[in-house]
């Protein structure tokens, strides 16, 4: 397929050597020697590598992220005699790339159709400008994966303990170094982002937000860029990923051409699933809008204030803390007299006593704030009667 795509160029300028047997992970010295000699005498060595059926297929799970040793060894040996090495990968999922920093380029083809050879030739020879972006993070090692400690489990049960922290949500939250981040992908040209605009500075969760940004092709070749929009929740209501992809758009630009792209965000773009109401909930507060070329390449940011129209009922039980109650206006009304009494009791110790010197008033206040309701009966002289009659106005 590649030879047909290249036509006469293939016959005149391309020399081929097999290098390894795809059916087994074994170093064939004769094949290896031929490949090294061929690469040594070339201007550029293009190595096709990846995962054979024995390593990756439907019906069973991979046990590691490595490619066949014979392929990694071939790449390392060719790097000894050739500075310009391009690796074309055919694989259905991420692989470890111990040679990634040494090769000139990597073309990730994944598992394409029968015309993949011609498509790869068009990219390698500059007829087509690549514009794909990674839909997954490529970690350095299998052990970096968030599910590593829990999979495959005990043979009978697998626990999915990652929660929402899967993929880039995990790696970016932990600020872990990765081989290639989510949304990453190179081009033969370059793009510049500018003039991020939001349709509103404040919105309700019943409204939509229009986000626009200018993108310019600053290179010499026509190309396409995938502009990615991430949202970061700054309300601190619950633990959430540091940012989440909420929209994206692909724009084609001629050299030095600039266009404005617009994306829309709605309630779901800011929301998380709240089990107290069994619905998607976006809390009131500040949210950051981030525009980037990948999850690790953020170019522009702005903030928007969101007002929630959904009221979350407060569940009060014996383990509810004083600080949680004081954040609720109705609960604060009921708790005011009790809190005042506790504050007075905290400051009522005998002056100069060893206990007063050892435990500061600030420490006692922190202890009070973090104390559950059930502790009121013994904390700072609150009586059982006061505790029993603690009710909230409706």
Segment roles from a protein language model:
Residues 322-384:
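Conserved, compact domain cores that house catalytic/ligand-binding motifs in diverse enzymes
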Residues 307-327:
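Low-complexity, Pro/Ser/Thr- and charge-rich linker/hinge segments at domain boundaries
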Residues 42:
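An anion/phosphate-binding loop that grips the pyrophosphate of nucleotide cofactors and donors
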Residues 4-31, 51-55:
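Short connector loops at secondary-structure junctions
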Residues 15, 90-222, 290-291:
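Secreted, periplasmic, or luminal enzymes acting at the cell surface/secretory milieu
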Residues 1-10, 389-394:
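Single conserved hydrophobic/aromatic residue that forms the stacking wall/gate
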Residues 165, 175, 187-313:
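Intrinsically disordered, low-complexity Ser/Thr/Gly-rich stretches
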Residues 51-68:
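Glycine/threonine-rich flexible loop motifs
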């Amino acid at each position: 397929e590649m030879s047909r795509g290249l036509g006469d160029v293939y016959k005149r300028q391309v020399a081929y050597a097999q290098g390894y047997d795809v059916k087994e992970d074994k170093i064939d010295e004769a094949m290896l020697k031929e490949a090294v000699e061929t690469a040594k005498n070339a201007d550029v060595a293009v190595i096709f590598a990846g995962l054979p059926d024995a390593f990756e297929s439907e019906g069973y799970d991979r046990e590691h992220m490595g490619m066949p040793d014979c392929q990694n060894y071939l790449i390392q040996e060719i790097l000894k005699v050739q500075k310009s090495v391009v690796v074309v990968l055919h694989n259905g999922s991420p692989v470890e790339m111990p040679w990634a920093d040494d090769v000139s380029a990597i073309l990730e083809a994944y598992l394409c159709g029968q015309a993949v050879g011609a498509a790869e030739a068009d990219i390698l020879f500059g007829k087509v400008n690549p514009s794909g972006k990674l839909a997954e993070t490529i970690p350095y090692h299998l052990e970096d994966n968030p599910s590593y400690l829990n999979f495959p489990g005990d043979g009978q049960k697998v626990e999915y303990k990652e929660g929402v922290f899967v993929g880039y949500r995990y790696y970016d939250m932990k600020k872990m170094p990765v081989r290639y981040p989510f949304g990453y992908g190179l081009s033969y040209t370059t793009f510049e982002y500018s003039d991020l605009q939001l349709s509103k500075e404040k919105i309700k969760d019943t409204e939509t937000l229009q986000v626009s940004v200018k993108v310019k092709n600053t290179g010499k070749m026509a190309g396409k860029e995938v502009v990615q929009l991430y949202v970061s929740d700054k309300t601190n209501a619950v633990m959430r990923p540091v940012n989440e992809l909420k929209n994206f758009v692909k724009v084609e630009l001629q050299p030095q051409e600039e266009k404005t792209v617009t994306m829309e965000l709605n309630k779901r773009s800011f929301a998380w699933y709240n089990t107290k109401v069994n619905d998607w909930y976006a809390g009131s507060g500040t949210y950051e809008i981030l525009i980037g070329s990948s999850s690790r390449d953020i170019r522009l940011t702005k903030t928007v204030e969101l007002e929630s129209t959904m009221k979350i009922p407060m569940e009060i039980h014996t383990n509810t803390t004083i600080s949680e109650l004081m954040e609720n206006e109705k609960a604060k009304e009921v708790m005011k007299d009790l809190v005042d009494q506790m504050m007075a009791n905290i400051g009522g110790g005998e002056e100069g006593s060893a206990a007063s010197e050892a435990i500061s008033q600030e420490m006692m206040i922190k202890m009070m704030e973090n104390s559950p309701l059930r502790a009121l009966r013994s904390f700072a002289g609150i009586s059982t009667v006061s505790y029993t009659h603690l009710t909230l106005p409706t």
